[in-house]
């Protein structure tokens, strides 16, 4: 039911193209996943999301457990029916909230007790409970519960959290009983090569349908991010999809693909879009800026998204300056389409044998310019 088919390999790097087959369709890799934390990509309908070329989205177990609750989602027919999205969905386990809500939680080997950010009530999540929630949600891919420590933690504390992550993975595997849902394990270990190697080998030993690398882009130096991207893949199985969590910048995606990663997610396209910032190649345009008031060109003349085909920078500037909801929708749509266009261009470049780890196809001097 779940199969990862490698369709081409790059002769210059470790990049590859592939197809990840799921019960709700296939994902052509490398591929960016838009983030729909609450079973919605903020401000965008499922139909609009389809128009961007999105093939898989991410939702969050922790937040959906709090509201509306997994039982209601299951009663609706599962998360696909609930949000009217027929393509693959991956649910994050809530491990990131162990990091982001650190001041509101208490961690033990059994799980994490959270203070509900909505009403202050106490919520306990164990690895077993996290898996049961995801089984009720009915996502295509469930993530194992992991402990994502802050990047400032010392090596001993990182190692302690790693042992917890590995113990939780074993409990997740024991609990997971859903044949039409894949379970991915998560590699942790901070910036320490010894711990990353240990975690990658441990996680790989279970022969799961896919493997993720977490604890990246959580405030650490760019050099540390690149070190993990360069180092970890050599310890991961070649025949499984590799998911690099929380990465959405073009430079890091390009470097990650060059090292053999396949799937990526990030909130930046919609977070920046909601504040009026649009992607243009490797630039970011703040459309709130007065210089766009009389600019009647699209965000990107080469982009075929609905926003660029239909609206000018001047109109988007007007919407954002007047806090019109349509503005955040249109810019978010473009930003998502831009990242998907980028990963699609990478795929073409790999197949045409012109991909490099500093991929920038919008430059006319690039040998991969035809992919853009």
From Swiss-Prot:
Its EC number is 2.4.2.29. It comes from the Bacteria. It catalyses: 7-aminomethyl-7-carbaguanine + guanosine(34) in tRNA = 7-aminomethyl-7-carbaguanosine(34) in tRNA + guanine. Gene3D superfamilies: Queuine tRNA-ribosyltransferase-like. GO terms for biological process: queuosine biosynthetic process; tRNA wobble guanine modification; tRNA-guanine transglycosylation. InterPro entries: ArchSynthase1/Queuine_TRR, TGT, TGT-like_sf, tRNA_ribo_trans-like. Its cofactor is Zn(2+). It is an enzyme of class 2 (transferase). Substrate binds at residues 92-96, 146, 188, 215. Residues 246-252, 270-274 are annotated as: RNA binding. GO terms for cellular component: cytosol. Keywords: Glycosyltransferase, Metal-binding, Queuosine biosynthesis, Transferase, tRNA processing, Zinc. Zn(2+) binds at residues 303, 305, 308, 334. The active site is at residues 92, 265. The keyword Transferase applies. One of its GO terms (molecular function) is tRNA-guanosine(34) queuine transglycosylase activity. Homodimer. Within each dimer, one monomer is responsible for RNA recognition and catalysis, while the other monomer binds to the replacement base PreQ1. Belongs to the queuine tRNA-ribosyltransferase family. Catalyzes the base-exchange of a guanine (G) residue with the queuine precursor 7-aminomethyl-7-deazaguanine (PreQ1) at position 34 (anticodon wobble position) in tRNAs with GU(N) anticodons (tRNA-Asp, -Asn, -His and -Tyr). Catalysis occurs through a double-displacement mechanism. The nucleophile active site attacks the C1' of nucleotide 34 to detach the guanine base from the RNA, forming a covalent enzyme-RNA intermediate. The proton acceptor active site deprotonates the incoming PreQ1, allowing a nucleophilic attack on the C1' of the ribose to form the product. This is Queuine tRNA-ribosyltransferase. It comes from Prochlorococcus marinus (strain MIT 9215). The gene is tgt.
């Amino acid at each position: 039911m779940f199969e990862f088919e490698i369709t081409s390999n790059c002769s210059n790097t470790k990049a590859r193209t592939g197809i990840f087959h799921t019960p709700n369709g296939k994902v052509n890799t490398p591929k960016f996943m838009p983030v729909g934390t609450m079973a919605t990509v903020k401000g965008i309908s499922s139909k609009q999301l389809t128009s961007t070329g999105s093939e898989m989205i991410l939702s969050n177990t922790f937040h959906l457990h709090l509201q509306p609750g997994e039982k209601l989602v299951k009663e609706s027919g599962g998360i696909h029916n609930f949000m009217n999205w027929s393509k693959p969905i991956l649910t994050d386990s809530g491990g990131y909230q162990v990091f982001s809500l650190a001041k509101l939680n208490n961690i033990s080997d059994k799980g994490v007790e959270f203070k509900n950010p909505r009403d202050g009530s106490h919520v306990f999540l164990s690895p077993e409970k996290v898996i049961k929630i995801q089984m009720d949600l009915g996502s295509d891919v469930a993530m194992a519960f992991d402990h994502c420590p802050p990047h400032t933690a010392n090596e001993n504390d990182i190692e302690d959290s790693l042992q917890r992550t590995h113990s939780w993975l074993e409990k997740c595997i024991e609990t997971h009983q859903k044949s039409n849902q894949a379970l991915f394990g998560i590699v942790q270990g901070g910036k320490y090569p010894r711990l990353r190697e240990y975690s990658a080998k441990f996680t790989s030993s279970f022969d799961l349908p896919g493997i993720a690398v977490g604890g990246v882009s959580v405030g650490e130096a760019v050099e540390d991010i690149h070190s993990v991207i360069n180092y970890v893949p050599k310890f991961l199985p070649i025949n499984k999809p590799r998911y690099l969590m929380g990465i959405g910048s073009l430079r890091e995606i390009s470097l990650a693909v060059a090292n053999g990663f396949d799937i990526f997610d990030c909130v930046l396209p919609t977070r920046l879009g909601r504040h009026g910032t649009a992607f243009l190649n490797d630039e970011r345009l703040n459309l709130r800026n007065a210089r766009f008031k009389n600019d009647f060109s699209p965000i990107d003349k080469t982009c075929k998204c609905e926003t660029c085909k239909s609206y000018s920078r001047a109109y988007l500037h007007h919407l954002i300056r007047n806090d019109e909801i349509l503005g955040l929708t249109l810019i978010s749509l473009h930003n998502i389409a831009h990242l998907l266009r980028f990963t699609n261009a990478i795929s073409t470049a790999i197949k045409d044998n012109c991909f490099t780890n500093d991929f920038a196809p919008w430059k006319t001097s690039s040998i991969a310019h035809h992919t853009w």
